């Protein structure tokens, strides 16, 4: 099978892009978690927090994390699918090609979605 993306420069470019998008994914999830933890700290430390504003921040964080993370994952999947036979036969190549991307996306939706829904619901319904 001939692959037009098999030169050494293409391999270096793929590795660089994968590193960059992996770092972007890491920082997106980290910022989302930090934002949610800070929001929880604000809610617990201030008695009269504006419920609607807090919910808006949580929803904006959810949207940012999901859109950015899904884009990073799609890029990583595309980078993996561009590997030539030699790269894809390595352990790392096989791991990238067999990664359960939909499972990762589902976990993000469940975890950040659950945080957003539960904190917003609790904060909006408390007296």
Which stretches of residues belong to each language-model region?
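Membrane-water interface of transmembrane alpha-helices
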Residues: 67-83
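Conserved small/polar residues in nucleotide/adenosyl-binding loops
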Residues: 122-127
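Final/C-terminal transmembrane alpha-helix of multipass membrane proteins
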Residues: 100-121
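Short membrane-interface loop/juxtamembrane segments of multi-pass integral membrane proteins
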Residues: 14, 18, 82-101
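Helical transmembrane-bundle signal
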Residues: 36, 61-68, 112-119
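Membrane-associated alpha-helix detector
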Residues: 2-65
């Amino acid at each position: 099978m001939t692959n037009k993306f098999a030169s050494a420069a293409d391999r270096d470019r793929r590795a660089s892009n994968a590193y960059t998008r992996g770092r972007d994914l890491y920082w997106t999830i980290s910022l989302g978690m930090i934002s949610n933890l800070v929001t929880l700290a604000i809610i617990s430390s201030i008695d009269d927090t504006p419920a609607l504003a807090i919910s808006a921040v949580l929803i904006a964080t959810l949207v940012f994390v999901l859109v950015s993370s899904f884009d990073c994952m799609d890029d990583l999947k595309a980078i993996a699918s561009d590997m030539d036979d030699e790269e894809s036969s390595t352990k790392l190549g096989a791991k990238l090609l067999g990664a359960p991307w939909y499972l990762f996306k589902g976990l993000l939706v469940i975890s950040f979605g659950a945080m957003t829904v539960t904190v917003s619901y609790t904060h909006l319904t408390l007296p």
